[in-house]
Design a protein with these regions (language model features):
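Pepsin/retropepsin-fold aspartyl endopeptidases
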Residues: 1-121
């Protein structure tokens, strides 16, 4: 189980995850939990430096800003010491690293801001 952090100023929830490069190097990042994103992981193309395999470079998706074409990679994410190979949506317009609703199908999200509890596991 990993502990999250609530950004009160922007009303956003973040969890620290690790992105794993093909060389095994771990990069720790704060990922925004976005319940409007139905995938596993999304990130800006300038943040992609992991030598992950490309699956599709013209994948159409609807976003809050309309439809766009994105690249899809298979990336490795480490959460709470466990590694997952997941599809990663990559595009120039994605402002930060995002984890989406697919995680909530495999991980339990507990949020009680009054009690200071925010966990994913």
């Amino acid at each position: 189980m990993i502990q999250g952090r609530f950004d009160e100023e922007r009303n956003q929830v973040f969890f620290e995850i690790s992105l794993v490069g093909n060389d095994g190097e771990l990069i720790f990042v704060d990922a925004l939990l976005d319940t409007g994103f139905t995938g596993w992981l999304a990130m800006n193309s300038q943040d992609l430096d992991f030598n992950w395999p490309l699956v599709d470079d013209q994948y159409p998706m609807n976003t809050a800003r309309g439809e766009g074409d994105f690249s899809i990679y298979i990336g490795t994410v480490q959460i709470d010491g466990q590694e997952f190979n997941v599809p990663v949506v990559v595009g120039d317009e994605i402002p930060e690293i995002i984890i989406g609703m697919e995680w909530l199908k495999t991980k339990r999200l507990v949020v009680d801001l009054v009690a200071g509890i925010l966990s994913l596991g």
